[in-house]
Amino acid sequence: MVWWKIKSKTFFNLTFELYMNMESSYVKKTDIELLSIVPKNSVDLVLTDPPYIISKGSGMDEYKKHLDAGGEHVKHPDGSKNSLALTTDFGEWDNSYTIDDLEKAINEFYRILRPGGSCIIFFDIWKIETLTKLLSKFSKHRFIEWVKTNPVPINQYATYLSNAREIAISCVKGGKATFNSKYDKGIYEYPIYHGSDRFHPTQKSLPLFEELIKKHTNEGDLVVDPYVGSGTTALAAKNTNRLYLCGEPSDEYFQKGYNRVKKIT
């Protein structure tokens, strides 16, 4: 059970602190709207997958439009067709998000985590150095790798598969962290979702998140994710007997994720 201190009152030099019992909550809010209502030092784990800020600037979406309009494949110097003919336009949730937005959220993560609380953030592998710098106030930085056992075979005939793994950084807000594991390499092999089970472009593995939650928290602890998307973090917390506070601003994904967690069809 998690109790949040909501206010303090002083009468005749005596201070009384008022608390409320925290229950799991899945809400339609932006990241800062959600995080701003969370008291400081009250969260055991932030487990999240923010927008990777990769939709714009890559040129890949424009190249896809070029092909759709009847344009020719651009030849790679090695003579092969350009293997990047895929859109990376994940929608408004990624297009409008910036590094400054991520930095504001990370500052809030640090505020709301208890001493010894953990933060795990999945992010674009090519921007991991930037993420590490944003997490400089945290300690015990470690890499986590999700190896996909059934990756989409992009570039399969040209080079190594380009989407066969994802990287996260795990770190701690001072204090002694909860870590229910030993000799852990931080490498996890799980499949991605396909077909009707997949409705979000960056949907994460449920068993992966269940394993991470069990290692970094104990039953009854509170897990926060302000970018819950498909609802995976909330469902993983629910399945492992943890409390969750999760937010999603998109109408479409909020409803789909909420229905998934609440098992509404």
PLM feature segments, named:
Residues 1-4, 10-254:
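Core catalytic lobe of class I
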Residues 126, 262-265:
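Class I S-adenosyl-L-methionine-dependent methyltransferase module
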Residues 257:
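Conserved SAM-binding loop
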